[in-house]
């Protein structure tokens, strides 16, 4: 016996769909094709009825078991937009009986399609099943990295759907779903320079690639949805053939180079900092950290100081705030004093560049690139000594070169 989703909770029934003959159990691909055919022909279109009733009206019997749903890459009310390709980047359902909101080609729009609580919770379960965060035996058992029951989870399903789901009491008004659709093909540096309206200049792109080659750690800053992951992916692809790369993320998103491996923190139930330190035993040339937001900042700086540079993203409105945040995060667990952290960030052993991507001149692009200047006199609490390499000029509407590199890795050459 297994479990399936019906009437808002799990109930027991036979592993086999009731209307299928014993020798004709459909494959997951056949189930997916059947569901999408029903959806495309309008037989599956009312998401305000209970799940079992909706499926029965569509001629699908009582649906599938939880184990069968876990094998089918179908997302019910959201599936039409999941299939929309690069046009749709985000989908939101902000509570029971609320409408689906999508971001299509950069424009947010209300679809007018309402989703009842039962289908909303079904969609949450499907995302969590496909991401491997819950089991078919108990799909409503949400657990955090420490094994404790939680009411909010985020991750990636099918390597392309980055999601966040919440339920009461975390979300007191009811369940919510937010999904970001990752690109089927990650943009390259050439795409960002030439075909995306100039997200950054060729000169800036070449400098960042050369910096990675020469052991500089890059800190890529921006707000949510600003393009931090896109820029990181483009830089990774540019040096993929040259470096052994280890990527550490909450859940897998970034493209994996040929000589590389990925670590998923949520699945490992370890901390980011522990994963960073563990990767040092796996001989990386470059460590990529999906997002710095805590004590893993210290682990990244320590890794860079021992010859293991990295690329990491961070939420910040500009480059100097990003560097201050990195410094603050590195002291959070008390394992290093502010003075020690400042010493690492301004030492020749940890060449460091910060990049900010955000809205400049009315659209998304790189607007600031600065390097931290090597110095022995900088004190914690003082402004970090820095050298602006590129800055956006609002008068010319361009990213322009400011000063040459001062660090030993590029002085006199870049």
Where are these regions (language model features)?
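N-terminal anchoring/assembly modules that precede and organize ATP-driven motor systems
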Residues: 2-108
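NTP-binding/hydrolysis catalytic cores, primarily Walker-type P-loop NTPases
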Residues: 66-70, 363-414
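P-loop NTP-binding catalytic core
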Residues: 100-214
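Switch/coupling sub-region of P-loop NTPases
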Residues: 216-218, 234-348, 356-357
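The conserved Walker
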Residues: 224
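Phosphate-binding/switch region of NTP-binding enzymes
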Residues: 341-379
């Amino acid at each position: 016996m297994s479990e399936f989703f019906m009437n808002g909770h799990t109930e027991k029934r036979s592993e086999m769909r009731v209307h299928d003959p014993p020798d004709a159990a459909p494959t997951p691909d056949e189930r997916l094709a059947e569901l999408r055919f029903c959806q495309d022909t309008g037989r599956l279109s009312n998401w305000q009825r209970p799940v079992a009733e909706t499926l029965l009206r569509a001629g699908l019997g009582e649906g599938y078991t939880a184990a069968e749903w876990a094998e089918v890459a179908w997302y019910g009310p959201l599936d039409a937009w999941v299939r929309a390709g690069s046009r749709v980047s985000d989908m939101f359902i902000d509570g029971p009986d609320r409408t689906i909101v999508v971001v299509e080609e950069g424009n947010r729009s209300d679809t007018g399609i309402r989703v009842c609580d039962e289908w909303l919770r079904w969609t949450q379960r499907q995302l969590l099943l496909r991401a491997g965060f819950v089991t078919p035996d108990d799909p409503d058992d949400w657990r955090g990295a420490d094994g404790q029951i939680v009411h909010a989870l985020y991750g990636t399903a099918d390597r392309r759907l980055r999601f966040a789901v919440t339920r009461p009491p975390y979300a007191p008004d009811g369940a919510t779903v937010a999904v970001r659709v990752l690109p089927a093909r990650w943009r390259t540096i050439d795409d960002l320079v030439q075909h995306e309206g100039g997200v950054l200049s060729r000169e800036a792109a070449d400098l960042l690639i050369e910096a990675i080659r020469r052991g500089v750690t890059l800190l890529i800053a921006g707000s949510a949805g600003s393009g931090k992951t896109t820029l990181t992916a483009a830089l990774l692809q540019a040096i993929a053939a040259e470096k052994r790369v280890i990527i550490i993320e909450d859940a897998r998103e970034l493209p994996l180079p040929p000589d590389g491996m990925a670590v998923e923190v949520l699945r490992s139930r370890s901390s980011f900092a522990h994963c960073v330190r563990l990767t040092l035993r796996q001989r990386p040339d470059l460590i990529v950290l999906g997002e710095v937001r805590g004590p893993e900042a210290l682990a990244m700086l320590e890794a860079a100081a021992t010859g293991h540079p990295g690329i990491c993203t961070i939420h910040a409105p500009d480059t100097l705030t990003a560097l201050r945040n990195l410094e603050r995060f590195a002291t959070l667990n008390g394992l290093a004093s502010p003075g020690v952290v400042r010493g690492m960030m301004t030492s020749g052993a940890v060449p460091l560049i910060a990049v900010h991507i955000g809205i400049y001149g009315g659209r998304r692009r790189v607007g600031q690139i600065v390097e931290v200047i090597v110095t022995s006199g900088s004190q914690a609490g003082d402004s970090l000594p820095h050298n602006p390499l590129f800055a956006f000029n609002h008068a010319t509407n361009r990213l322009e070169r400011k000063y040459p590199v001062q660090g030993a890795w590029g002085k006199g050459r870049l």
